[in-house]
Every structure is written in C-alpha cells, then in structure tokens.
Amino acid sequence: MKYELIKKQGRARRGQLQFDRGTVETPAFMPVGTYGTVKGMTPEEVKDTGAEILLGNTFHLWLRPGQEIMKLHGDLHDFMNWKGPILTDSGGFQVFSLGKTRKITEEGVHFRSPVNGDKIFMDAEKSMQIQYDLGSDVVMIFDECTPYPATHDEARISMERSIRWADRSRNEFDRQENPNALFGIVQGGVYEDLRDVSVEALTKIGFDGYAVGGLAVGEPKEDMHRILEHTCPLLPEDKPRYLMGVGKPEDLVEGVRRGIDMFDCVMPTRNARNGHLFVTGGIVKIRNAKHKVDTTPLDPECDCYTCQNYSKSYLHHLDRCNEILGARLNTIHNLRYYQRIMASIRKALEEDRFEQFVEEFYARRDREVPPLKDL
C-alpha cells in the first residue's frame, strides 16, 4: 500500500491510497461487510454506490465460516467476489462488546462463542493469522478497546496492554512476511496524556497507517472532537489516519475537519433496514404515515438507483409490508448518500472551498458549525 497526500486545507487532507487491487480516493468511507457481505447488497451494487474499499470483520468470519472454508476459495476477496481492497478489523472491538462473557489477560482474551457457546481464545498472533488467511489489504493490530467511562488508571492499563499487543501484532505480521499493510490503533480513552503515550509508542514500532480507536463508544461528541484535535497532529503526516466505527454524516465532516482520512460504520446500512434514510436536509423516517401518499423521490438531489426510480410512497409501502426489496432499496440509497458526501468533501478540498462546504452542510440542516480549535 502507498499513501499520497495530495492537498491540505487547514487540517483536512485530500489523498489517495494505492493498492494492487485498486486506488482508494480519500477521505473515504468504507461500508461494513461483517459476514462477507454488506447486508442485502451484491458486491456490484456496493461498488455502484461509489465504494472503493470494504471492511470485513475478522472475529465473525473466524467463527463463521472459519479459516478453512475461506482458504478453500482463496481468500475473502474470492469468497465474496469483491475485486477491490478490503480492510479487516482485528476482532478487538467485538471481543470488547461481549462484556461479561469475556476475560482479558496479558496473553489475550478468553470468551465463549456467541454462535455455539464454545470456549475460545484469541490473541494478537491469532488475529494476525486469521487476517493473513482472509487476504486483507489492510490488517489491523489486535488491541483492547477502552470502554467509556473509564478512570485514568483503567484507561492507562488498557492502553499499555494495547501497546504490548501492538508490538506482538507487528512481530507476527513480519514473521508471516505479509506483503499487505498493517495499521496501529491509538488508544487512551478521553485522556490526552494517554493518547500522547500511545502515539509515541506506536510510531516507534512503526506502522503503515494509524487508527484512532476507543471513540464512538458512548463519550460526548465534545470529547471525541477534543481527542481528535489533540491526536491527529501527533500522527505522521505521510501515513493515512482512520477513525474507527464512525459515524453519522456530521461525524464524517467533523473527522475530516480534524485530519481523518478513513471511516467505517454500520449506520447507513443498519438505519436503512430500520427505515431511517439520510437525505440532503437530514433524515426521512420512511415508515411515518405521511409518506403513504408522497409520490416524490426520497431525495431530489440524489442520483442513486432508488431515488431515480421509486417514490417515498412506494418505499413506505415496502417498509410497512416488511418486503426485502424495501431494505435493499433503502440500503442502496443510504450507502450512496454517504459516498456522495465523501465525494463532495474531496471535490471541495481540491477546489480550496472546504470551509464553504462545511458551512453549507450545516446550513442545510439548520445547525451551527461546531467549534474547531485553532491550528
């Protein structure tokens, strides 16, 4: 993988990630394909929304279908027929999400399979091995996602363990002679001094890119913005920066304002299945009764297949009847909406009018632009 920083405006960065499997324009949003599929979509449909890179889930793909089935096909690209690059998370967040059913030790994490209740152990080395078998273009280190809230001491202990696991991840990745990219993950909760320690340790180990982890786990937006404003300037300028698990459309804009290049989130797909559809002015709740007789498209400004061919009335009908097509059309629209935002951000950066884009983005939502700490 090669990263090229093409242009900057303030902290916002316009760049390019170059892989053997294709080029990814940044800032980029990655749809989430947890089980080797973006729910309800064919790979061709996902590509048509503008997506250039997908996220796969190491933890879930390890449990089902497992490494052996994956290797029968070649790798995850072959298994799901996605021709472009794939980033896989390490499984750390999913293990963190298991709550009381898991036990964290220095060696790794003991837990019970959410599929069949079997006792399972995962560590940094195992995560690297699974991701190697998946053929991931971007491999994430195995880390511990610090919960919120956490005391300074709890966050410090968690962050220090993540650093040791990062070192083990790097060593195993190098032992495999994996030709792909390995990203480190900055932890430290909402504490700036701990983020400093994490960044220093990770950059000393050396990675192809750096993720900011442990955010969007329940902390106030102000804390997320503060940590991003503090952390991003500490990261190497010539490496991509990835904000994990984020987020709402405004979170993408705020992340870019603070120097982030890559995002992923289940929100556009999950919300689509629940009838919450993103449009230029905000959100349409398609199951509301008022849409029953509305023959207009979902978003007149959208060029997606759904908006070009169907009315709000039809989408409302599909939702009320619980038709699979409704979830599919909604997902096509929401994914395209996210990709249109990213394309608009990239164009605004190319044309040196990113600040104007931000003002217009919030004006259309009747909201104030959130404050940004001066450079």
UniProtKB/Swiss-Prot annotation:
It catalyses: 7-aminomethyl-7-carbaguanine + guanosine(34) in tRNA = 7-aminomethyl-7-carbaguanosine(34) in tRNA + guanine. Catalyzes the base-exchange of a guanine (G) residue with the queuine precursor 7-aminomethyl-7-deazaguanine (PreQ1) at position 34 (anticodon wobble position) in tRNAs with GU(N) anticodons (tRNA-Asp, -Asn, -His and -Tyr). Catalysis occurs through a double-displacement mechanism. The nucleophile active site attacks the C1' of nucleotide 34 to detach the guanine base from the RNA, forming a covalent enzyme-RNA intermediate. The proton acceptor active site deprotonates the incoming PreQ1, allowing a nucleophilic attack on the C1' of the ribose to form the product. Belongs to the queuine tRNA-ribosyltransferase family. Pathway: tRNA modification; tRNA-queuosine biosynthesis. InterPro entries: ArchSynthase1/Queuine_TRR, TGT, TGT-like_sf, tRNA_ribo_trans-like. Substrate binds at D89, S90, G91, G92, F93, D143, Q187, G214. One of its GO terms (molecular function) is tRNA-guanosine(34) queuine transglycosylase activity. One of its GO terms (biological process) is queuosine biosynthetic process. Binds 1 zinc ion per subunit. Its EC number is 2.4.2.29. The lineage of its organism: Bacteria, Pseudomonadati, Pseudomonadota, Gammaproteobacteria, Vibrionales. Keywords: Glycosyltransferase, Metal-binding, Queuosine biosynthesis, Transferase, tRNA processing, Zinc. Its cofactor is Zn(2+). GO terms for cellular component: cytosol. Zn(2+) binds at C302, C304, C307, H333. PANTHER family: QUEUINE TRNA-RIBOSYLTRANSFERASE. Homodimer. Within each dimer, one monomer is responsible for RNA recognition and catalysis, while the other monomer binds to the replacement base PreQ1. It comes from the Bacteria. The gene is tgt. This is Queuine tRNA-ribosyltransferase. The active site is at D89, D264. Residues 245-251, 269-273 are annotated as: RNA binding.
